[in-house]
Amino acid sequence: MKKKKALPSLLYLVFIVLLPWGVSSSFNKCLELWIKNWWNTRQSETLLTDIQEKRILERFIELEELSLLDEMIKGKLKTHVQKPPTGIHKEIIQWVKINNEDHLHTILHFSTNIICLAILSGSFFLGKEELVILNSWVQEFFYNLNDSIKA
């Protein structure tokens, strides 16, 4: 009888330990694409997409270079011409990408934590009987351990 009660409680313990890990990893993979898609569509309302932004910046750089070349040909510029500040554009784009990735990961972790909490809460409320069996099994184990230490 004790073995029959101990086996479901051990399975329940394994269920409580392994389920959140499995759910978290699977939801991270599944929800990541959905959240990125949602985030990019929301961002596209106010900002350009990365591809459009890169194309526009490349065109501006080409236009600046062409205008500098045109002015050099006309002889209006000195011989020491500095390059346009393209590094600033690249740094801003990199910073925006890092910031967006950070927001995406925060949303992803928050959503998976809520899902895991809901699953654990549901399994706790549905499995109170299993927890009682598990609790009595742990108490019996400690009593036996205490008796063996005294002996």
Swiss-Prot record:
Keywords: Antiport, Chloroplast, Hydrogen ion transport, Ion transport, Membrane, Plastid, Plastid inner membrane, Potassium, Potassium transport, Transmembrane, Transmembrane helix, Transport. It comes from the Eukaryota. One of its GO terms (biological process) is potassium ion transport. It is found in: Plastid, Chloroplast inner membrane. The chain crosses the membrane at residues 7-27, 107-127. It is a multi-pass membrane protein. GO terms for cellular component: chloroplast inner membrane. It catalyses: K(+)(in) + H(+)(out) = K(+)(out) + H(+)(in). The keyword Transmembrane applies. Its main location: plastid. GO terms for molecular function: antiporter activity. Contributes to K(+)/H(+) antiport activity by supporting proton efflux to control proton extrusion and homeostasis in chloroplasts in a light-dependent manner to modulate photosynthesis. Prevents excessive induction of non-photochemical quenching (NPQ) under continuous-light conditions. Indirectly promotes efficient inorganic carbon uptake into chloroplasts. Belongs to the CemA family. This is Potassium/proton antiporter CemA. The gene is cemA.
